[in-house]
Amino acid sequence: MDFKIDFSKAFTVNQYLLTLLIAVGFLKLIASPKKEKNHLLPKGKQSFIKTYLSVHLFGSVINISSLLLVADKMYKKSPLNPAQIVLLTRAFASDAYWSPFFVAFAAAITYAPNLQTYTIISFGIFLAITAFMITYFDVTKDKKFNIDEFNGYPLSLETLYLPIILAILVLSTHYFFPNLKVIVLISTFSILMTLFILPLKKNFSEALKILKYHILNELPKMKSEISLFLVAGLFGILIGSVLTGLNFSLPFEVFDYKVASLLLLIFILLAFIGIHPIITIAMIGDFFVNANHTLLAMTFLMAWSTTVSTSPISGLNLTIVARYNCSAKEIFMLNIFYALKMYIVCVICLFVLSKYLNI
């Protein structure tokens, strides 16, 4: 047995992930949504669809800020009802399937750096659309959701052109300069766009004040998330070193859709007992260096999205429980069958992706 711990890697393995987490935070300074101008907000199915899209599309860029913005407005009127809880958890969590601005994508690209970005996003968007269709079917067919009386809070989508421009910049630059890491491009363009557009939307002195406030007040509030990812990297490398020293090897030769499906199930079960997906990813990442990185990354993203919406101890659900006086058990019961359906969809998707990649 030969135990060697790479302490340098332990503290730096998640540095790109942290860079993205901090850089994308600047986007909310220029891409924050506005309330729809229509004072008579629609009720029922139309309201559900518009609100779902609002949380999902803005959540893909400005992260949990979009969910809190909508949920705060809902909670002011009355306690969150089952339909609203389902919308908030699923609309936000399904961003993890595809959004390159989401921290889940950063985790995937950290441990599977050779992934095919376009393939991941394409399959991820399909999963996000499927998640919406399953959710919409659930709330319209089950009378307990009382969808005809649903009160939503749609947001104006006019500022969404900014992340679209950002995505075009990132993907086109990566196409011409494939050696540049996507995660570095997203981080760089996020800050550059903020520095360029904020003074155009406000005046220069106001933009300076907003930037100063964000750097001095908002960034320090991210200490919990940053600590989680630093500890995950450290813990993952230490566990990996121990397993390597014990001559641990994976019980399979080819990482195909069958192994990926089993790995996805393990991720989900571990998340339900409190082990964050980033911890599991960090622990096993080094053992999959020879696997197909696109299939591996897709498995990571599927695990992240499916568990975030359902696990009673995910960061998202703990926030909803604490902030809006909801029941963790209720959230779990509302989403557990959704998670099961999405797992089946994910397995089918892994099979198709595996065939597409000729594995």
Q: What annotation goes with each model-predicted range?
A:
Residues 69-82, 106-117, 256-314, 322-324:
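Membrane-interfacial helix-loop connectors
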Residues 18-28, 75-77, 127-137, 189-200, ...:
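Alpha-helical transmembrane segments and their membrane-interface exit regions
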Residues 2-74, 208-288:
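Membrane-embedded alpha-helical segments and adjacent helix-loop junctions characteristic
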Residues 78-163, 172, 318-349:
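Membrane-core helix-loop-helix motifs of multi-pass transport proteins
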Residues 350-359:
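Juxtamembrane boundary at the C-terminal end of a transmembrane helix
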Residues 54-62, 88-98, 272, 303-309:
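Helix-loop-helix module between adjacent transmembrane segments
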Residues 1-15, 135-240, 358-359:
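Hydrophobic transmembrane alpha-helices of multi-pass small-molecule transporters
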Residues 8-21, 53, 118-131, 178-193, ...:
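Alpha-helical transmembrane segments
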